[in-house]
Amino acid sequence: MRTIRKVGRETAELTDEELRYIDTRVVESVKPVLVGRRLFPVFNVGHAGFTTVMGYKQTDMSQAIIDMYGITQSRDRVELASFPIKVPVLHKEYKIYWRDLIASRNGGLPIETMNVENAARQVAEEEDKLLITGEYTGWPALGIEGLAIATGRNTKASAGAWPANAITDVAAAIGENETDGHYGPFALILRSSWLAKLRALIANTGIFYLEKVAELVKAGIYVSDSLYTSAGAVTNALVVELSQENFELVIGQDLSTFNQQDEDMNINGKVYEVVAPRIKRPTSICEITGLT
């Protein structure tokens, strides 16, 4: 009689090497998607237990004093208006089938990670919408505000007819932020369809509109199709001053994976993170509205 073969050895929990490979593929798959992370400085709260953090809207002190002996008192304080910010879990589940795992282990091939990578991209896309836009009509996000819908942000109506008026629009948005004491460097955030218009040549020159706009926004031009208006339209762009003093990404748990074998011998997995945008000085943001 043959010895009964041990069932489950080839379909056991993922090895350390397989887990490292999965994590590597997750990181590589989200890099092109995470535009917001290039804009937001990070504030790490240390663990995923925080469900809320406090945000603070601040006002400036009174102006400094000029005198001969420095004895006139001008002491006051920055006024801070506090408000709670929810820190949600962004997650997407996936499955690795046991037969695919056997094929990988016996065929000398890397583990199949298409489902894992797709799940990671879904999480990254949600993160980018959360940071760059926040909750908008048609996309519920626990009322969390990103750059495009931040209460107290500046707005400037577009002169329309892009790319002809793109330079004028961006310059006007910078002016709005400068009026509130923000002097750059500024970045421009826009959707790919509006960037395409900037690749046109200015009449009677060999210069692209994109080149002239780039001269105004020294912190760079960032392209993200996660940018929407509060109503869910795609007719806006943002000019922002990059600084942790203005806004930051709160991280309780950075992008991670969790894997567990089920009763059917398959691996159930989850890509997840615990993050939220915290907008401190919304006057560092100007939304250009009504692009045409």
What are these regions (language model features)?
Residues L142-E211:
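Extended, solvent-exposed, turn-rich assembly/linker loops in the middle of proteins
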Residues A12, L80, R105-T113, E178-G181, ...:
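Short, charged/polar micro-motifs that form catalytic or ligand-binding hotspots
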Residues R37-G108:
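Long, hydrophobic/aromatic-enriched structural stretches that serve as scaffold segments
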Residues M1-D60, R199-T292:
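Sequence/fold signature of self-assembling virion shell proteins
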Residues H91-A172:
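Alpha-helical scaffold segments that mediate packing/assembly in large oligomeric complexes
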Residues V87-V89, Y183, D264:
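A general secondary-structure signal for short beta-strands and their flanking turns/coil
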Residues K92, G184-F186, I267:
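Structural beta-strand/beta-sheet cores of well-ordered domains, especially the beta-sheet scaffolds
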